[in-house]
């Protein structure tokens, strides 16, 4: 079975068994994908407030009770094992990347699942729009911008964006399509000159892989949930767990069920 034809449940099974270890862009098409942040209960409200104040990069899909690892948006799933790769931060610095966080998870851990732009890729592909990173077998390009998010408590971060190149006419269509997906970042936040949002070189993404921008194409930028990882690690907490960029949690929610019209 092709990756795009997998059900969300089947993909999670492959991830849990170690058979799938790569980014999830283009996989299980039609299912909503999510960013993950796990942090201590005492900081959960402030982080929730950060997400509420910054809904474009951090749209909330699910917040679990302390110590719970089975999300309501994917009954039977296990957030400790069902992502291809996790990042472990200690005192605000990246310590390691792992494929299982069961030994680090505790009764004090609160998990947040936030919408991901991979979720509207199926609609873009159906409209004949290019998803260059899928075409080239790469992770999506992600960049830290010069735009600040609204802080909350100890949490602050610059806005992170994903970039997908396309022609100007395709960009107009992409705006029309993605505006509907408000819980997975919605419409682009910027189209065109990357320097206007503080990006110096498209060939050097901060996360993910560079992709080819062809003659006649322009970069189109969407808010990205990796913003949440920068925010969660900004106060240098003893332990924070996030997804590894591009290695998302795939829920049982359907893309088309999450649109505003």
Task: Map each language-model feature to its residues.
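Metallocofactor- and cofactor-centric catalytic cores in central/energy metabolism, strongly enriched
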Residues: 1-115, 126, 131, 156-230, ...
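Active-site glycine-rich loop that binds ribose-phosphate moieties when present
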Residues: 116-118, 133-150, 169
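Contiguous alpha-helical scaffold segments within structured protein domains
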Residues: 150-156
